[in-house]
């Protein structure tokens, strides 16, 4: 299971439409379908009931959606925390100057 599979699943679950999910994710419909199908294979269950006209979450899909959406939300928050920590990190550097007096021949 990877984050791309989770993103595709969550987006399809929210839109209940593979085409709209693909557009939202800037992916092709076959790519989104592949990610969802590979996730279903990995989990060993169907997450969606598909007909030619509609997509609907199965009971397993509904249960998985709650956790998958939370995982993605927590990941995004974690990334934001890391970015914020990096932005607030102060970097110090030293500048050393060596003063030398002019030599008599430079005068």
Region spans (language model):
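Conserved amphipathic alpha-helical core elements
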Residues: 9, 39-40
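A short LG(V/I)-centered, amphipathic sequence patch enriched
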Residues: 40-59, 80
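Single conserved hydrophobic/aromatic residue that forms the stacking wall/gate
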Residues: 99-107
